[in-house]
């Protein structure tokens, strides 16, 4: 197991790197994994298992009004992509995990985006 707090930061940054410091991926998007895990708009849906019944391409996630408060799920939002502080299994854009909305940590962030 790698201890990320004491590991050699071979990219030159011990924690987060400045936005856009490395080349974009093939889609032209910067920093999709390894910098910070990002909050997304999706609510956690533990009861209906939304992602198994959602469209394959661009699932927008359930809305809170469509989720019953089952086992705390209606109070949790989704984090996606891994961060500098996560394990190797989190270092892909498709990784996701539910956390309570008030959860804060130094390796979490969000991405501002707009349609163009």
Regions found by a protein language model. Name each.
Residues 2, 6-17, 26, 31-116:
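Surface-exposed recognition segments
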Residues 20:
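Acidic/aromatic-lined carbohydrate-recognition and catalytic surfaces
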Residues 23:
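Active-site neighborhood of thiol-dependent amide/isopeptide-bond enzymes
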């Amino acid at each position: 197991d790698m201890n990320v707090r004491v590991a050699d930061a071979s990219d030159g940054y011990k924690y987060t790197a400045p936005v856009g410091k490395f080349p974009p991926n093939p889609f032209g998007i910067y920093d999709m994994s390894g910098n910070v895990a990002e909050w997304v708009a999706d609510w956690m849906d533990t009861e209906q298992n939304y992602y198994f019944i959602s469209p394959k391409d661009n699932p927008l996630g359930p809305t809170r009004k469509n989720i019953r408060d089952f086992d705390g799920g209606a109070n949790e939002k989704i984090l996606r992509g891994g961060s500098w502080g996560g394990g190797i299994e989190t270092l892909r854009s498709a990784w996701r995990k539910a956390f309570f909305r008030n959860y804060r940590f130094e390796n979490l962030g969000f991405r501002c985006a707009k349609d163009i």
